[in-house]
Amino acid sequence: MSRPRRRGRDVHGVLLLDKPQGLSSNDALQKVKRIYNANRAGHTGALDPLATGMLPICLGEATKFSQYLLDSDKRYRVIARLGQRTDTSDADGTVVEERPVTFSEQQLQDALESFRGDTLQVPTMFSALKYQGKPLYEYARQGIEVPREARPITVYELLFIRHEGDELELEVHCSKGTYIRTIIDDLGEKLGCGAHVIYLRRLTVSKYPVERMVTLEQLNALLEEAQTRDIAPSELLDPLLMPMDSPAADYPVVNLPLTSSVYFKNGNPVRTTGAPSEGLVRVTEGEAQKFLGMGEIDSEGRVAPRRLVVEYPV
């Protein structure tokens, strides 16, 4: 007889986790889900186990809007080891080639310049992108290389921080879908010495404030404090959450009057003033501007529902 499924609570929002090194993004997600006793949870844009930094964890209804964070810009600090190339392009892999580091500082600056702006990037085999339904890393672990299409990316900023011996430190502000490991591997090839990532930290995702990041240690400490004070953990944990609509913060807002919002919530497109002429919009209602979900301007200029919040009783 199967054990009845444990019922969590309906908690909605985005936690900005400072993911520790050595933990997979999914393991970090499960820890946060347990700490919050949440019914649903999902992360937006995995970080490698080697990487640390901002990992937005969406809880409850916020999971419906996590896809919009996948499209956002990100900023990283990375340290590369020069002179060694690995099969995964980071320190978790096996060294497959060693070469002397002989480039000049001018050659380094010229190489860095070639990565700035709009470029095409061939994703690493050690990635979660899928080929014929399977993640690329599953093929890579079997020693199989499959064709990958080059994808357009944008590197808005590539800042040189330091070059000391066989270490090179950079800061990268980039578009969605950019693999920092691939940038470092490609840079190593351009410099003729090979390179791989030994340190990677995601500094920011979209416009989320860095000061709102929290660690697993801080979350567990709050759990202990709640137990000591004999209060519900939610009293200490829930104030850490960003609003459930924050993943879609970059989209324009359309506020519907209560007379129109009832139709919108029932799945019908509605006409309203002040809406853009096209594209996705964040829809709110009334004076309180309560978030209803995402809409899209249809061919008749109406706001059509695309993804709505389920209204839970308080």
Curated annotation (Swiss-Prot):
<dbReference type="InterPro" id="IPR032819">
    <property type="entry name" value="TruB_C"/>
</dbReference>
<dbReference type="InterPro" id="IPR002501">
    <property type="entry name" value="PsdUridine_synth_N"/>
</dbReference>
<keyword id="KW-0819">tRNA processing</keyword>
<dbReference type="GO" id="GO:0160148">
    <property type="term" value="F:tRNA pseudouridine(55) synthase activity"/>
</dbReference>
<dbReference type="GO" id="GO:0003723">
    <property type="term" value="F:RNA binding"/>
</dbReference>
<comment type="function">
    <text>Responsible for synthesis of pseudouridine from uracil-55 in the psi GC loop of transfer RNAs.</text>
</comment>
<dbReference type="Pfam" id="PF09157">
    <property type="entry name" value="TruB-C_2"/>
</dbReference>
<dbReference type="InterPro" id="IPR036974">
    <property type="entry name" value="PUA_sf"/>
</dbReference>
<dbReference type="InterPro" id="IPR015947">
    <property type="entry name" value="PUA-like_sf"/>
</dbReference>
<feature type="binding site">
    <location>
        <position position="43"/>
    </location>
    <ligand>
        <name>substrate</name>
    </ligand>
</feature>
<dbReference type="Pfam" id="PF01509">
    <property type="entry name" value="TruB_N"/>
</dbReference>
<dbReference type="InterPro" id="IPR015240">
    <property type="entry name" value="tRNA_sdUridine_synth_fam1_C"/>
</dbReference>
<feature type="binding site">
    <location>
        <position position="76"/>
    </location>
    <ligand>
        <name>substrate</name>
    </ligand>
</feature>
<feature type="binding site">
    <location>
        <position position="200"/>
    </location>
    <ligand>
        <name>substrate</name>
    </ligand>
</feature>
<protein>
    <recommendedName>
        <fullName>tRNA pseudouridine synthase B</fullName>
        <ecNumber>5.4.99.25</ecNumber>
    </recommendedName>
</protein>
<keyword id="KW-0413">Isomerase</keyword>
<feature type="binding site">
    <location>
        <position position="179"/>
    </location>
    <ligand>
        <name>substrate</name>
    </ligand>
</feature>
<dbReference type="InterPro" id="IPR020103">
    <property type="entry name" value="PsdUridine_synth_cat_dom_sf"/>
</dbReference>
<dbReference type="GO" id="GO:1990481">
    <property type="term" value="P:mRNA pseudouridine synthesis"/>
</dbReference>
<comment type="similarity">
    <text>Belongs to the pseudouridine synthase TruB family. Type 1 subfamily.</text>
</comment>
<dbReference type="Pfam" id="PF16198">
    <property type="entry name" value="TruB_C_2"/>
</dbReference>
<dbReference type="InterPro" id="IPR014780">
    <property type="entry name" value="tRNA_psdUridine_synth_TruB"/>
</dbReference>
<feature type="active site" description="Nucleophile">
    <location>
        <position position="48"/>
    </location>
</feature>
<dbReference type="GO" id="GO:0031119">
    <property type="term" value="P:tRNA pseudouridine synthesis"/>
</dbReference>
